[in-house]
Amino acid sequence: MDITIQHPWFKRALGSLYPSRLFDQFFGEGLFEYDLLPFLSSTISPYYRQSLFRTVLESGISEVRSDRDKFVIFLDVKHFSPEDLTVKVLDDFVEIHGKHSERQDDHGYISREFHRRYRLPSNVDQSAISCSLSADGMLTFSGPKIHSDMDASHSDRSIPVSREEKPTLAPSS
């Protein structure tokens, strides 16, 4: 099968809002018609974008919330088990690392690895941080904020990932 290379001057109808899946974290998870023939699918039906936002919403994008009382990170890690995840607090950062060895899926064999690093607000009580993984693969990292009259404790430590049996509701802004 011959696949033409897309020239840099050729832009998709929605530009950067419509990312290609050929070279991102979806590599190896199967291709859609618009991945191979983006100009053809937009020419035939410019309003037909079956999975335009599905890939964005399911891409492992994290959401960070910092309100008056707590600091929370939501991260989609549906391809990882708690044993595959390492969560550490180092200085004023939280580091989340996931890695699983090669395993078989619908499209062949795949191994995955990611590393995310987030800066913690200075008023997060690092001794009270918790981390859990829901049944639908949403990792929730949370730490309470302390008020200015109390002193935040800072130390390097690993945070255990506990498993929850119920799915996490999709984070809403």
UniProtKB/Swiss-Prot annotation:
Q: Where in the cell is it found?
A: Cytoplasm; Nucleus
Matching Pfam families? Crystallin, HSP20
Subunit structure of this chain's protein: Heteromer composed of three CRYAA and one CRYAB subunits. Inter-subunit bridging via zinc ions enhances stability, which is crucial as there is no protein turn over in the lens. Can also form homodimers and homotetramers (dimers of dimers) which serve as the building blocks of homooligomers. Within homooligomers, the zinc-binding motif is created from residues of 3 different molecules. His-100 and Glu-102 from one molecule are ligands of the zinc ion, and His-107 and His-154 residues from additional molecules complete the site with tetrahedral coordination geometry.
GO BP terms in the entry: lens development in camera-type eye; negative regulation of apoptotic process; protein refolding; response to heat
In this protein, which residues make up the domain named sHSP?
A: 52-164
Protein name from the UniProt record: Alpha-crystallin A chain
Residue numbers of N-acetylmethionine PTMs:
1
Q: Where is the composition biased (Basic and acidic residues)?
A: 146-167
**Family assignment?**
Belongs to the small heat shock protein (HSP20) family.
**Residues where Deamidated glutamine occurs?**
6, 50
**Where does it primarily localize?**
cytoplasm
Start and end residues of each stretch annotated as Required for complex formation with BFSP1 and BFSP2: 1-63
Spell out which residues are annotated as carrying Deamidated asparagine. Answer: 123
Q: What's the source species for this entry? A: Osphranter rufus
Q: Which positions bear N6-acetyllysine?
A: 70, 99
Q: Name one GO molecular function term.
A: metal ion binding
